[in-house]
Amino acid sequence: MMRYALGVEYDGSEFLGWQQLGEMGPSVQATLQQALASVADASVRVVCAGRTDAGVHGQCQVVHFDSAVTRPPRAWILGTTTRLPSSVAVRWCVPTSEDFHARFSACARRYRYRLLNRQVRPALQHQFLSWERHPLDAQAMHVAAQMLLGENDFSAFRSAQCQALHARRELQAISVRRYAEVIEICVQANAFLHHMVRNIVGSLLMVGTGERPMEWIAELLAGRDRTMAGPTASARGLVFVGPLYPAKWHLPMEVSV
């Protein structure tokens, strides 16, 4: 058996999320596995670096799979992509060792959240942008966000459905920047809880509108009470930028540190 790592890009708008959930609806996982199976002429199961929810997009999701069939990387890339819908594409393929694991070998994961901050909702690229009509203070949001850095208990920002054994995560970097009418929030952590990014964004938006002071974010973190935090932000503006791996795995630069 040969193990391969793939970099996968997808528009999550038409999917119920990454994970295959029986017959409930289309998933990125099932769609990718079906295309890979056609190339391998055998069933294929993929393991991803980070599962995404319904409507969340993937810029460079990393997966691994095992196959008894040997194909050159170009064949896996082109053969699989031609069998995928236009919303999913395989960007790269790297043969790797059986010790590599898309999830457990990753040392960090990155997300980006983008929203349009103007009076009128977006018509173009609306599936990739959230929207907030009230003026936002991006600098206040950025300062408040820095209070979340480090290893902390993020219970205030986890969903009620989160199945993680504990809520401690290391938030390694977070920034809030304005580019004309677009606010961009970038987050990196060793791992994330269910809805963690969207819940953080929802609370930062309340700081941005002036509804809450910057110090409120630190109070939420210390309080560990989800019911006291802001609402969950829309999935529409969220992109899983991708995981990061140690250089020893010899993966493309965009996912290596």
Swiss-Prot record:
EC number(s) given by UniProt: 5.4.99.12
Primary role: Formation of pseudouridine at positions 38, 39 and 40 in the anticodon stem and loop of transfer RNAs.
UniProt record similarity statement: Belongs to the tRNA pseudouridine synthase TruA family.
SUPFAM superfamilies from the UniProt entry: Pseudouridine synthase
Keyword Isomerase set for record: yes
Gene: truA
Keyword terms of this UniProt record: Isomerase, tRNA processing
HAMAP family: TruA
Protein's name in the database: tRNA pseudouridine synthase A
Enzyme class: isomerase
Catalyzed chemical reaction(s): uridine(38/39/40) in tRNA = pseudouridine(38/39/40) in tRNA
Binding-site residues, substrate: Y111
Oligomer status and interactors: Homodimer.
GO molecular function: RNA binding; tRNA pseudouridine(38-40) synthase activity
Active site annotation, chain numbering: D53 (nucleophile)
Keyword ATP-binding: no
Domain of life of the native organism: Bacteria
GO biological process, one term: tRNA pseudouridine synthesis
